[in-house]
Amino acid sequence: MEKENRGITLIALVITIIILLILAGISISALTNQGLFKNAKTAQKETEKAEAEQGQRLNEYEDEINKYLENEDENTKAFKEKVGKVLSTTDNTELKDAKNNKIVVPAGFKIINGATTVDKGIVIEDVTETATKGSQFVWIPVGTITKADGTSTTITLGRYDFNSTTGKESTYSGSFVEEDSNDSSTLKKYGNTIAKSITNFKNSVVQNGGYYIGRYEARTATARSAKDNALTQITEKGTENVYNYVTQLQAAELSQNMYTIDKFTSDLMNSYAWDTAIVFIQKCGTNNKYSRQNSLNTALLQTGTNSLTDTSKIDVQCNIYDMASNIEEWTTETSSFSSNPCVDRGGYYNRSGIYTSSRYPSLTSDSYDGIGFRPLLYL
């Protein structure tokens, strides 16, 4: 539930009311204390005294406002001082954004210029790993956050259904599952690849207040044209080619091996990560029904909608591109159909009837031009 935070506007309103009350008191006193003309000298002294007291109070209020503004500026300044710098190559670094929201930057990454608050989409970039250098990810905050406009909102990690009319989320009620390697009762063993550890993912999100998803559909330097193309290095660079013609098993392998250092974990998108990202976008982006958005492009874009000059066709929310557009994306979710166990999500350029929150069961062998994937990171 969203609510208004107290801020400068409230302070200004309080000051205005106090000043009006002071002036009203002065006027009443001057007019009613045994007659205006008879007590003119007394009234003048009282007025001068009241004006002095009023001036003192205004100075005090101004000091408080200045302190508030200075603190706000200091938060923004402190955050901006961290932008563009590798904070550590060996450890993850906890930061606060301009509104005092928590962010954790992985070892070897930097925050790039742009958003200074989490609701706008904080972007990090890999600057140390040779194979993946330049890859970008967006922080998905979980919990109660303060937005750039001073209001607050709450994003809860979960698997969701989305109302077809309003876009509002509710607890997922379908039969697809997110298998957990730590819980044998959830294992279907249908042949698709499941997440490394949903338990570890959820615990990390709680501890760190969020997770990262690829800014773009997975990319690769070499354009792909057939399902039997050799697997190549995965990146998250917006200038490279979409990684299509890939099976769910291949997408999981590439995502899970994207990073192998012990400070954070890479994996293929799971249903918690996908659905919670939609909730984040609907609460912080410009489309509160993004869950029902279908593809903005109607032909395959090899470098995604981020490369378009027609801005009306660019699918971007909170610095995240193409969850609703271009190609469908594999996840680690498992369908209820043993013959079609893989689940892909998101919009597809060739099908107007599917959208961001769509879930589709697919074969483990499915691989075509309109299917790709997106990696995630958690700490």
Task: Enumerate the predicted regions with their spans.
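Acidic glycine-/aspartate-rich tracts in secreted/extracellular proteins
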Residues: 28, 143-146, 217-220, 332-338, ...
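Aliphatic-rich helix starts adjacent to a transmembrane/signal segment
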Residues: 30-54
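GGW-centered surface loops in extracellular recognition modules
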Residues: 75-149, 266
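Short, solvent-exposed loop/turn elements at domain surfaces
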Residues: 146-155, 220-225, 352-355
